[in-house]
Amino acid sequence: MIELVCEDEPEVVCLQELPVWGTSRLAEWSAMKAFPVVARPPRMPGRVGVRVTRMNQGFFRSAFVGQANAVLVSRSLVAEDRGYLRISDPGRERRVVQAVGVAGRYVIANLHANHGAEVAQLETERSRTFAETASRPGEAIVLAGDFNLLDLRLDGYSAASAGVVDHVLVSGVSVSTPVVWPRERRELDGVVLSDHAPVDVTIG
C-alpha cells in the first residue's frame, strides 16, 4: 500500500496504524524521507509478532506487532522532526500526534485518534493545540490522519472530507477540495490493500 500511495511522487504522506517492525523500511518502500513514531510498542519482538498476527489478521491486528504513525516527505524538501505527544488518556489505547516541519513553510501534524465521538474530539483538540504550538511564525498548519470522526469541524481550518474518518485539515494557506480514493484505486489484483481510503489534497 505504501508503494501504491507513493508511486505518483507526492511531497508529503501521513500514515497511521503501521506495524512497528515496518518503520525501519519506510524510506526504502517509499523512496521518501521517513519520520516514524511508535504509538504502541509491540508485545512480541520482530517476526514472532508478525507470524502470530498473520494467523488471524482481523482478530489480532496490532496487538502483537505494535502500532506506529509516520510522516513521509519528498527527498527534495528540507524537513525536521518537531516531536510528538500522547493524546490519549491513561487506560485508553495509546495514541499520539507527531509534528514535522517541511520546507520552512508548513508544519505537518499526523494523528490517530481513538474510537468514540467524545474521546476522538478531545484527542483532536489536543492534536490541534500541539500542532499550533509546534508551528513557527509564517508556517501553515496541516492536521492530518485518522480522526475517527465523520462529522468534523475545526474553526479556522479547511473543510473535512465527507463520509470518511480520515481527514486533511489546513490553516493558513489555500487548499483544494479533498479527494477520497475510490475502492478500485486501492486494489491490487482484486485485493483491497487498506480498509481506509487515502485522502488527497493540494496545498498552497
Feature map (PLM): residue ranges:
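Metal-dependent phosphoester-hydrolase catalytic domains
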Residues: 21, 77-88, 128, 132-142, ...
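Structured beta-strand-rich core segments of catalytic domains in phosphoester-bond hydrolases
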Residues: 12-14, 18-104, 181-182
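Active-site beta-strand/loop signature of hydrolases that rely on acidic residues for catalysis
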Residues: 1-26, 72, 100, 107-111, ...
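Short, surface-exposed linear patches
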Residues: 5-12, 35-38, 92-95, 129-133, ...
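Short, glycine/charged-enriched secondary-structure capping and boundary segments
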Residues: 1, 27-30, 49-50, 123-124, ...
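Conserved residues at the C-terminal ends of beta-strands
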Residues: 16, 114, 171
